[in-house]
UniProtKB/Swiss-Prot annotation:
Documented effect of changing residue 51 to A: Loss of activity, cannot complement a deletion mutant
Outcome recorded upon mutating residue 168 to A: Loss of activity, cannot complement a deletion mutant
EC number: 2.7.1.235, 2.7.10.2
Protein name: Lipopolysaccharide core heptose(I) kinase WaaP
Record-linked InterPro entries: Kinase-like_dom_sf, Lsacc_core_hep_kinase_RfaP
Top-level lineage group: Bacteria
Annotated effect of mutating residue 161 to A: Loss of activity, cannot complement a deletion mutant
Known partners and oligomeric status: Interacts with acyl-AcpP. The WaaP hydrophobic channel can accommodate acyl chains of different lengths, but myristyl-ACP is likely its physiological binding partner.
GO cellular component: cytoplasm
Regulation affecting activity: Acylated-acyl carrier protein (acyl-ACP) acts as a very tightly bound cofactor necessary for the production and stability of active WaaP kinase.
Length: 268
C-alpha cells in the first residue's frame, strides 16, 4: 500500500481508512466512468479535484491492449508525473493526497487529490475567437513561447502527456493577463507517462496533438516557427533540416485528427 497525505486531508482523515474517506467525499462530479470517478469538492472553502480509480478488470485491460491503447490502471501515473514536473520546474497541479492499495492491476484501488487551480481559463477557451479578434501580437508571441518551453521542459524531464491539447494548459486570471505578466499551468496528467527520457514516438504524438488542437486559432507560419525554435532550443535552420520528417508527419497526423473531429465532433 502507498499513502501520502498532506493538509487538510492529513487532519480530516486522521484515524480513518483513507480509501473509504475519499469515496465519501461529496461534490460536483465531472466524470463517472467504469473504474474512474472525477469530482470537485471543497474543504474549508478551498476547492480540490479528486480522481478515484477502481480496478477495471482484466477483460477491459485486454481490450485496451488489443486495440493498441495503453490502459490507465490507477492514480500512480498522475502522481509520478506531477512529482517529476515539480522537480523540473514545470508549473502544474499540487497533489495533497495520494493512495494506492492492491497489487493486482485489474482490481487496484487508488486515488489522487489535487488543489484546484483557480481562477483560470484554458487556452482553448482563451483563444477561441482569435481568428476574428486577434490578440495583441506580443501576448500571442509570449503565450506561444511559454507553451513551447513548458512542453519542451516536460519532455526533457521524461514526461509525455498523451492528451497534450491546448485545453489542458490553464492561464491564471487572478490578475490581468499581459505579455509581460502571466502564468500557465499544465493539467490533466492521468494518462501521462514518466521515464528517464521521453521516447521520440511519444514526444511526437504530444507535438502532433498540440498542433492539431491549435489549428483553428489563427496561428501564422511565424508563430509555428517561433514555437519550434523555443521547443527545440536550436537555430531554425537546423530544426527545419534535421526535423523535416517529424514536421511532415505532424502535418499529416494533425490533418487526420482534424478530419476525425469534423466527422465525429469531440469523440476522437
Amino acid at each position: 500500500m502507498r499513502l501520502v497525505l498532506e493538509e487538510p486531508f492529513k487532519r480530516l482523515w486522521n484515524g480513518r481508512d483513507p480509501f473509504e474517506a475519499v469515496e465519501a467525499l461529496q461534490g460536483k462530479v465531472y466524470r463517472e466512468l467504469e473504474g474512474r470517478r472525477t469530482l470537485r469538492t471543497e474543504v474549508d472553502g478551498r476547492g480540490y479535484f479528486v480522481k478515484i480509480h477502481r480496478g477495471i478488470g482484466w477483460g477491459e485491460i485486454a481490450k485496451n491492449l488489443l486495440t493498441a491503447k495503453l490502459p490507465v490502471l490507477g492514480a500512480r501515473q498522475e502522481w509520478q508525473a506531477i512529482r517529476r514536473l515539480h522537480e523540473a520546474g514545470v508549473a502544474t497541479m499540487t497533489a495533497v493526497a495520494y493512495g494506492e492499495r492492491g497489487s493486482d492491476p485489474a482490481r487496484q484501488h487508488s486515488f489522487i487529490v489535487t488543489e484546484e487551480l483557480a481562477p483560470t481559463v484554458d487556452l482553448e477557451v482563451f483563444s477561441q475567437d482569435w481568428r476574428e479578434r486577434p490578440p495583441p501580437p506580443r501576448l500571442k508571441r509570449a503565450l506561444v513561447e511559454a507553451v513551447a518551453r513548458m512542453v519542451g521542459d516536460m519532455h526533457r524531464a521524461g514526461v509525455n502527456h498523451r492528451d497534450c491539447y491546448i485545453c489542458h494548459f490553464l492561464l491564471h486570471t487572478d490578475k490581468p493577463v499581459s505579455a509581460d505578466d502571466f502564468r500557465l499551468s499544465v493539467i490533466d496528467l492521468h494518462r501521462a507517462q514518466t521515464r528517464d527520457a521521453t521516447p521520440k514516438r511519444w514526444r511526437n504524438k504530444d507535438l502532433a496533438a498540440l498542433y492539431f488542437s491549435a489549428l483553428d486559432i489563427g496561428l501564422t507560419r511565424r508563430d509555428k516557427l517561433r514555437f519550434l525554435r523555443t521547443y527545440f532550443r536550436r537555430p531554425l535552420r537546423e530544426i527545419l533540416r534535421d526535423e523535416a520528417g517529424l514536421l511532415a508527419w505532424m502535418e499529416r497526423k494533425a490533418e487526420k485528427l482534424y478530419e476525425r473531429k469534423q466527422r465525429y465532433g469531440d469523440l476522437l
